[in-house]
Amino acid sequence: MKVRPSVKPICEKCKVIRRKGTVMVICENPKHKQKQG
């Protein structure tokens, strides 16, 4: 999980979602997981 000021999809399978007001990227590739904060 990477914590970044700006989250962007890295590949085609990355999905940008919101959980409890936090923007996150979820993907098949665990390296692509990101969280805004």
Swiss-Prot record:
Designated name of the protein: Large ribosomal subunit protein bL36
Similarity-based family: Belongs to the bacterial ribosomal protein bL36 family.
Residues in coiled coil: none
Keyword Ribonucleoprotein tagged: yes
Signal peptide residue numbers: none
Any one of the GO BP annotations: translation
InterPro entries: Ribosomal_bL36, Ribosomal_bL36_sp
Domain of life: Bacteria
SUPFAM superfamilies, alphabetized: Ribosomal protein L36 (SSF57840)
Gene this chain is encoded by: rpmJ
Keywords: Ribonucleoprotein, Ribosomal protein
GO cellular component: cytoplasm; ribonucleoprotein complex; ribosome
GO molecular function annotation: structural constituent of ribosome
Pfam families (UniProt xref): Ribosomal_L36 (PF00444)
